Amino acid sequence: MVLLLVIIYLAFISLGLPDSLLGSAWPSMYGDLGVSIGSAGIISMIISGGTILSSLLSDRLIRRFGTGLVTFISVAMTAIALMGFSLSGSFIMLCICAVPLGLGAGSVDAALNNFVALHYKAKHMSWLHCFWGIGASIGPIILSYSLIQWKSWNIGYRAISIIQIVLVIVLLISLPLWRKVSSVQSGSDESNQQILSFPELLRLPGAKQVLIAFFCYCAIENTVGLWGSTYLVTVRGVSAETAASWISLYYIGITLGRLLSGFLAIKLRHKQ
């Protein structure tokens, strides 16, 4: 289970890598693409729409194919999408590539969150999202280096895509390990747990409040992540490569907060 947890953490690093790229690269991208600054919102909404859709379908997919295979296919989709981003020279092509990027991100996010919630402790869940922050912090740094060395955002996307491809290979090799864990758990109580529909989930005590809080948090996080670099470049006069590296500090702060929450989870009960 320890080896599998390491693989899960690596998968969440890969999940965070592309999440911070669009906002960091956009000050350099929109001019090359010949579109307005606000067009980043269209790409972001397509990615978010795919993420929401695949998250809602994740329960059926996991029960049909298993967490390991869903994670493998999802990361493969994000790797292909990122390679598409790196080869794109038009806004329409970016919008097309945003579809598999969102679908892949939503599936792997839901699948791994569900798996860790079932098989590990609250501290592991906090640290899981801490590793997402590590990936999100590294993404802008790689992009900044790409802009400094080659004056190209495409190469930054390509580098992240290659990292994703390496993880796809790791996940492919680890598929027997996922099946082994699933076979051990097949006779446990979790296989007999009641499956709730979405309306039934909303009727659970506190569910609506949690959704509202999560919505507000995501709105703040994504707004800063998407537009932070553009603000620094257009309003503060910072260079695009410097702005990209500065945004990584924002994600490092999130990472440290989630690391701390993992230690707090050891001392506090779930309701606290």
PLM features: residue spans?
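Symmetry-related core transmembrane helices of the 12-TM Major Facilitator Superfamily/SLC fold
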Residues: 155-176
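Conserved MFS/SLC helix-loop-helix module at the cytosolic interface between two early adjacent transmembrane helices
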Residues: 53-92
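Extracytoplasmic
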Residues: 3-29, 35, 224-229
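Residue-level signature of mid-helix packing/kink "hotspots" within the transmembrane helices
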Residues: 20, 47-56, 137, 251-259
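Extracytoplasmic gate region of multi-pass secondary transporters
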Residues: 22-23, 205-248, 252-255
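Cytoplasmic helix-loop-helix junction between adjacent transmembrane helices
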Residues: 97-131
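Small-residue (Gly/Pro/Ala) motifs that create kinks and tight helix-helix packing interfaces
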Residues: 26, 58, 135-148, 229, ...
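Juxtamembrane intracellular "pre-TM" segments in multi-pass secondary transporters
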Residues: 178-211
